[in-house]
Regions:
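Glycine-rich phosphate/pyrophosphate-binding beta-alpha loops
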Residues: 81-114
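Flexible, glycine/charged-enriched surface loops at secondary-structure junctions
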Residues: 40-49, 64-75, 90-95, 133, ...
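Gly/Pro-rich interdomain helix-loop hinge
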Residues: 112-194
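A glycine/threonine-rich phosphate-anchoring loop and its flanking beta-alpha core
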Residues: 1-42, 128, 142-149
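Short, amphipathic C-terminal "tail helix"
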Residues: 192-207
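C-terminal and late-domain segments of enzyme folds
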Residues: 20-82, 86
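Metallocofactor- and cofactor-centric catalytic cores in central/energy metabolism, strongly enriched
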Residues: 60, 174, 178, 203
């Protein structure tokens, strides 16, 4: 009964959103789309949505933040909805899981937290980490190869999965910086001692 029957996606509703909010939420959109695309639950039905959302973010987020023009705000509004359609069916990953736990503990902005985490999560996933749980069931790890798909679409170096992983992680980091986000937790007001004090618990909760 909580699920709406209609969603109104009207870019006029977001034209006055401050640039900082556009940056934070836009990077959240990018995280939604990226995690949906490399998810083990991804499918032919979600992949196209996720890739299109990523493309729209890289083409329009910076202008949406700095210029707040109708075209870029419309495209980012569409990207947000498209990414939502993707992750509602493919689910998300460890970046979002950690962002929720970090936000609850340190009261950080959700989208900004994802922006900071995402480059490191991309690099981690690119190492083909060992599976430590029984679900989801899969026989073939593919995140690194799917990052290569993303890098290829964006025109980034992608001759190998390893090269693509690093190129995409760097591109995400640089996009965040261009949008005015300080891409570290110290700038978000998290004390190093407090971070170390809670990091093990947060990692457990995120997992």
């Amino acid at each position: 009964s909580l699920t709406p029957t209609v969603a109104i996606v009207d870019p006029a509703l977001v034209l006055t959103v401050p640039g900082s909010v556009a940056a934070d939420t836009g990077m959240d959109v990018l995280t939604h789309a990226t995690e949906a695309y490399v998810s083990q639950m991804a499918s032919d039905f979600t992949d196209g949505l996720a890739l299109q959302a990523i493309k729209l973010v890289f083409e329009n987020l910076e202008s949406s933040v700095k210029n707040a023009d109708f075209h870029s705000r419309e495209k980012m509004h569409n990207a947000s909805t498209i990414a939502g359609m993707a992750f509602a069916n493919a689910f998300l990953g460890i970046s979002h899981s950690m962002a929720h736990k970090i936000g609850a503990q340190f009261h950080t902005i959700h989208g900004r937290t994802n922006a900071i985490l995402l480059p490191y999560v991309i690099r981690y996933n690119g190492t083909r980490p060992a599976k430590t749980a029984t679900w989801p069931k899969y026989n073939y790890y593919r995140a690194d190869e799917k990052y290569q798909d993303i890098a290829r679409m964006l025109g980034l170096p992608c001759s190998t999965p390893e090269e693509a992983v690093e190129a995409y992680a760097k591109a995400v980091y640089e996009l965040g910086e261009r949008c005015g986000i300080e891409m570290n937790f110290k700038a978000q007001g998290i004390d190093e001692k407090e971070w170390k004090k809670h990091s093990r618990e947060l990692a457990f909760l995120a997992y």
